[in-house]
Amino acid sequence: MHCFIIFSVINLALLQLALGASLPTSHATYPQSQPHATKRSFGPAVPSSVNGFGPFGSTYISANQRQSQQSDSNYSYNSGFGPYGGTSISASQHQRQDSQSNYEYYNNGGGLYSKDAKKELKDPSTSA
């Protein structure tokens, strides 16, 4: 009788090992169904598929503009929507924006510059 119990326990352990090796474990990683959220320095994370929404126009890279920005402030406007219409403006005005267009905006006192000609274009705010 004791041999039968020991034999049953050993068989049960071997069966669990065999099934455990074939079944996926609870620690397996699966691809995420939701889009990855980009990290922002101000406010909550926003999904990268959303473009131009949020309290400050969102600081992530939009798919159609393909632009990158560097800012010294805690939040900045970088959106095709909203009051600033696609021009990146940071709170401290120390920001450089690079895009695939021919223009760079230097908001640190700067004016509008052409990437190709490397000369300053006429700034409508300082036209005399």
UniProtKB/Swiss-Prot annotation:
Mark out the compositionally biased spans (Basic and acidic residues).
Answer: 115-128
Enumerate the residue ranges of region (Disordered): 27-48, 86-128
This protein's source sits in the domain of life called Eukaryota
Question: Where are stretches of biased composition, namely Polar residues?
Answer: 27-36, 87-101
Chain's role: General role in the development of germlings including formation of the infection structures.
Q: What is this protein called?
A: Infection structure-specific protein 56
Protein source organism:
Uromyces appendiculatus
